[in-house]
Regions:
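NAD(P)H-binding glycine-rich loop region in Rossmannoid oxidoreductase-like domains
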Residues: 44, 50-100
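Conserved Rossmann-fold NAD(P)-dependent oxidoreductase catalytic core, especially the SDR/UDP-sugar
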Residues: 25, 94, 100-148
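Glycine-rich phosphate-binding loop and adjoining beta1-alpha1-beta2 segment
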Residues: 30-52
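Active-site proximal helix/loop that lines the substrate pocket
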Residues: 34, 85-89, 125-128
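Short glycine-/acidic-enriched loop or helix-start segments at secondary-structure transitions
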Residues: 14-15, 38, 91-92, 131-133
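N-terminal Rossmann NAD(P)H-binding glycine-rich loop of SDR-like oxidoreductase domains
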Residues: 2-24
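SDR active-site strand-loop-helix element
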Residues: 5, 29, 80-84, 120-126
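Short, well-ordered alpha-helices that flank and scaffold nucleotide-derived cofactor binding pockets
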Residues: 13, 17-21, 41, 110-114
C-alpha cells in the first residue's frame, strides 16, 4: 500500500491521481475534508469518473504532528510520499510552520523507520528557500580534497 501525506494539496492531488492509476492501493492522510472539492477538481482534469476514483482511495484523517496517529496510519504501508507541508511567508506563523514542516516531517521519518517502510519520497518546494535579501548572495570557495 502507498501512503500520501498532503494529498489534498495542489501537487499532492495530482500525485494521488497518478498513483491511483497503478495497481497498488492508495491511502491518503488528510487534515481536513474541506479540501476534497479541490481534489475532485484536479481529478476532473484527468477523468469523468471522479467519484468512482475518489471512492477507490482510502482517505484517513490525521495530522503529521500526531506521532501516535501516524503509527496507526502506517500499518500495512510499503511506500510513503510525504508531500504535506505548510507554506506561509509571515513571521508570526513561524512556530506553526516549524511544528508542521520540521517536527511533522521528523514524525513521518520516525514512523517510516518504525514500520520498516521500503521507500520514503520527500517532496519540498521553493518555499523552503529563504526570501531574505541577506541570503540572496552566497560566496564559497571550492577546495577539493582530491582529484575525484
Amino acid at each position: 500500500m502507498i501512503l500520501v501525506t498532503g494529498g489534498t494539496g495542489f501537487l499532492g492531488a495530482h500525485l494521488v491521481y497518478q498513483l491511483s492509476q497503478k495497481q497498488d492501493a492508495v491511502r491518503v492522510l488528510y487534515r481536513s475534508a474541506d479540501r476534497f472539492e479541490q481534489v475532485r477538481q484536479v481529478f476532473s482534469f484527468y477523468t469523468d469518473q471522479v467519484e468512482a476514483l475518489f471512492q477507490r482511495i482510502e482517505w484517513v484523517q490525521g495530522d503529521i504532528t500526531d506521532i501516535y496517529r501516524l503509527n496507526e496510519i502506517m500499518q500495512g504501508v510499503d511506500v510513503v510520499y510525504h508531500v504535506a507541508g505548510l507554506i506561509n511567508f509571515e513571521w508570526r506563523q513561524l512556530d506553526r510552520l516549524k511544528k508542521t514542516n520540521i517536527e511533522g516531517t521528523a514524525n513521518i521519518v520516525n514512523a517510516a523507520l518504525a514500520h520498516n517502510i521500503k521507500k520514503l519520497c520527500y517532496v519540498s518546494s521553493i518555499a523552503a528557500m529563504s526570501t531574505s535579501p541577506q541570503d540572496s548572495d552566497l560566496e564559497e570557495s571550492l577546495e577539493p580534497i582530491g582529484v575525484f
